[in-house]
UniProtKB/Swiss-Prot annotation:
Belongs to the peptidase S16 family. Residues 1-22, 799-827 are annotated as: Disordered. HAMAP family: lon_bact. InterPro entries: AAA+_ATPase, ATPase_AAA_core, Lon_bac, Lon_bac/euk-typ, Lon_lid, Lon_proteolytic, Lon_Prtase, Lon_prtase_N. Residues 615-796 form the Lon proteolytic domain. It comes from Myxococcus xanthus. This is Lon protease 2. ATP-dependent serine protease that mediates the selective degradation of mutant and abnormal proteins as well as certain short-lived regulatory proteins. Required for cellular homeostasis and for survival from DNA damage and developmental changes induced by stress. Degrades polypeptides processively to yield small peptide fragments that are 5 to 10 amino acids long. Binds to DNA in a double-stranded, site-specific manner. Residues 33-227 form the Lon N-terminal domain.
Amino acid sequence: MSDEKKKGSAASAMPTAMAPPGLINKEDIPQVLPILPLRNSVFFPGGVLPLAVGRQKTIALIKDAVRDDQVIGVVTQRRAEEEDPGAADLYTMGTVARIVKLLKMGEDNYSLVVQGLARFRVVELVQEAPYLKARVDAVEDKTSSENVEVEALGINLKKLAREVIELMPELPAAATELVESITHPGHLADLIAANVDVPIEEKQAVLETVDLKARMKLVLELLNRKREILKLSNKIDSAVKGEMSKTQREYYLRQQLKAIKEELGEMGEEEEELDELQERLKKAGLPPDVEKVANKELNRLKTIPAASSEYTVARTYLDWIADLPWAKISEDNLDIENARQQLDKDHFGIKKVKKRILEYLAVRKLKNDMRGPILCLVGPPGVGKTSLGQSVAKATGRKFVRLSLGGVRDEAEIRGHRRTYVGALPGRFIQSMKKAGTKNPVMMLDEIDKLGADFRGDPSAALLEVLDPEQNNTFSDHYLDVPFDLSKVMFVATANQLDPIPGPLRDRMEIIELTGYTFEEKQSIARIHLVPKQLKEHGLSPDHIDITDEALLTLTTAYTREAGVRNLERRIADICRAVAVEVAGGKTEKQTINADRVKEILGPEMFYSEVAERTEVPGVATGLAWTAAGGDLLFIEATKMAGKGGMTLTGQLGDVMKESATAALSYLRSKAEQLGISPNFLEKTDLHLHFPAGSIPKDGPSAGVTILTALTSLLTGIRVRHDTAMTGEATLRGLVLPVGGIKEKVLAAHRAGIKRVILPERCRKDLIDVPDQARNELEFIFVTHMDDVLKAALETPPVGVAGTPGGEPGKEAPLPKPAESAPEVRA
């Protein structure tokens, strides 16, 4: 949308036209004027100004003014960026104007021409909508009896204006004639002030100067300053032209000197550097098209003086060409068993990724020219995604480079800047290839889901070429401007979530999902990796400290509750520091860290099972939720009070979750008699559903069965079993539909000490991905209808509930055999 602003710059090539002053009498100016805010310009009486308008308030103003043939007030804004200016945003002095021409340029854009008539002062704003109106006082020029001084000031003004015009050859000769033709001194001062290139504040000061003599003196100061600036500018311009002539002469002499040195066989340091560069280019193994470009640039470099800035630009470019690994490839370690041992040594679990790397090495062993895979590891923080890249590089015998993409918002970070820009460099991918020194490194693209985008472009769109196996063999960097082959690179991207990654970019990567660890896995990771690492970092040895299995269990259950192991490593580091203090103080005997010693060092337990406490009253149910950091418990609290049938929802809920609550209430009303609830329970009762942790946004359909269970518990007075958690979408007919994130939710239930988990029947297949420990220690109840849910979840099933739970208490549900591509339903 266009703004109300003057067409052209403040100092245009032709002085703004001025109409004769005194076109309106003071008595003819209304006491209340519609106000048109003006940006980046000051409008003077007698001036004729073209304007482009687009703000809705201004469009309404000009339509009314044209229809009623009334004058308007034009007032300059103090800050041009203000979209809806008020009294504080406008200057107090403006110009009465008449609209002399109006053209519609588009649907919401108009062009008009206004003529300045007289000055006015704003007394107060009396209207803000549909546009501004103000009560005003007309202002006339204050003239003194000293006409001789005013006449002298006018002569000086014209003289100074002629000098300024002569210093600006781009102005037409008519500019001088226009200035000479004006006889009215106030009109002359306003004309010059309107056209001289000075800040808006200084122009406004001229407009607000009512005393004619003071105004003319002020304009004289502005003109005099402008004249001095123009003189200095012309002087600098002449000096630059002279310097250019001098540079051209020096270049000619240098070329002659170079020819003389060649004849005498006296090559200088510059020539030796160029010969060395040429030799490096020959050894770089450049492709034919790149070699052609490099030789052309090298020949041009030989003709440029070393002191020239262009010499540095060309030399830097050729250095980049020579240093890139165009043909250097590191040999893959194709020993499958060695790679398996290396991966198992560095990382516990994550079998999917290890399996995929071993598959790649096996195929690479059979087919030598295979392209590098493009993997994307998706999972919560702390599960080992980033560190896995280094392990993959060790296992394959390749170089490792890492690119952190989190917060990158500039497309030039990926493709580089063109060489025309000062300080231009290649993008991060080319820089990383130079750092790796080989054509086939393992390149870790860390936090690819946290790429940004702004006015400088979208980096995720630039990555489409990099991560496309059909295109990245001719990747084009803006700085190099020649194709570079990235097809041999093994890309390993990491992300916490898939949703922020654009669909086309996600489609180019092979997604491998990593989930959280069980307690047993965390203890194994701590014993094998974390404890030895922290002992080494704190200068300790196994002779100083022995952390028992009991202590590790306490750490994983009472002091950390996360999908990964970062906080677990921090707590182990806390214990090591406490022991280090004692060892440094002279204590020599070996210290055994058990559960009591952990509590002594770390203080009170941070986590404990609160499910039983939360669900000890009717109306509270335990649900399961998926988050970017893994799964988590989601408590739902319901209460009732006297009212008129309303339902309040709190906890920062999204639209889908609100609709789930509405559907659950409708289902309960339709089944009230069957469940032993009064059919008219809403007539004198209000319901309130609350989802604790109100600062965290929540959404999704998977809380449907939990909401319905909590409401049923509240209205029947039957408590929900405290050892039971559930997830699933409930329909208006009571059917239970499948949801996603089952593995993460089940692991969250296991971490929290839940014993029974209610799942949709169609999610039975998703338990294949759940670790054996969690699967063996939990009882799974598969349901297809809400009757099954209520019978399994409530301590005493309500009267009239039909159906049976989908599983048998005390038995693990039978699991399907793994399939190559089993469909997975996600909420």
